[in-house]
């Protein structure tokens, strides 16, 4: 499935949307926002930096103009919500809990204005607070999108599970920065931004593994996935599904190629259900006790 913010309805020209597991739409906030100052995107070696700021025209516009076209393909639609406060998250989830929506992805990796701008998902306590508030306002499945910038991702994932999340999405972009040596200015208008693409894949893969070890709810892997081989790695690490982001900017047909590659891998390896791959990484038993304790306890 696409990662939120990396997909638009125009992709129907490049691939069969009915073959995707879900359509995840760009995050919407309950109030209008202009987004961050330009430049908002900068290419880096092995990836890209972005500081978009999640521009939004508000929920009314989103529900009236953005959401309806995505419901025409028979593929489950996942609405991603973003907010500045716990109350705004609760308000947003209540409004998007519609029959045409299959699940709600809460982008809790965004800044929490009630905690000096620290992302909700940076700490277990703020994670639990916001996910609990969201859970109380909807009967829809709730996916909590985490940040790789957390120092204890396993504890954050457990807080999501304890608060009632149905899945965790691991994860968003890694905070980064680049500078133009000619102008000596940051390449992004907001100075720092999220690093995505192949450069962050080993980080994201490690965190998916840690989340899988820490919780019983499904883990959705995201971060640097550009091929079927990448997707298989994430599933072996513990992901039950994957999201594709930056790769689709380079090749709009990337997700179609990944689906085809997964089909071929399953045929070649006599795999009846792709879920057989989830968590099937082979760890040396002599290393497992010490290493897995570390992996489960640390972030």
Regions found by a protein language model. Give the residues of each.
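Glycine/Thr-rich phosphate-binding loops of Rossmann-like dinucleotide-binding domains
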Residues: 10-11, 33, 114, 178, ...
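N-terminal capping/small domains of soluble enzymes
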Residues: 1-77, 83-84, 258
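Flexible loop residues that form catalytic
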Residues: 5, 28, 109, 173, ...
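Extended, intrinsically disordered, low-complexity segments
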Residues: 201, 260-299
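Alpha/beta enzyme core
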Residues: 17, 22, 84-220, 226-239, ...
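C-terminal helical cap(s) of enzyme catalytic domains, especially alpha/beta-barrels
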Residues: 20, 35-45, 179-193, 235, ...
